[in-house]
């Protein structure tokens, strides 16, 4: 059985509020860490969310 190409990742807020989004990415084509600007409802602003592993 082959290994799955897509993995689930957690996007954690860089504002240290504990807010996170869960998404998936293709680990074979996207080898670098994902950084996206998304909305953080705690600080009520758009901030950078960085990829971390789901534990």
UniProtKB/Swiss-Prot annotation:
One of its GO terms (molecular function) is structural constituent of ribosome. One of its GO terms (biological process) is translation. This is Large ribosomal subunit protein bL33. NCBIfam families: PRK00595.1 (NF001860), rpmG_bact (TIGR01023). One of its GO terms (cellular component) is cytosolic large ribosomal subunit. Belongs to the bacterial ribosomal protein bL33 family. PROSITE patterns: RIBOSOMAL_L33 (PS00582).
């Amino acid at each position: 059985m082959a290994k799955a190409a897509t993995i689930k990742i957690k996007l954690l807020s860089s504002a240290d509020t504990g807010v996170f989004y869960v998404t998936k990415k293709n680990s074979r084509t996207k080898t670098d860490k994902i950084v996206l600007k998304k909305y953080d409802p705690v600080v009520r602003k758009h901030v950078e969310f960085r990829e971390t592993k789901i534990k």
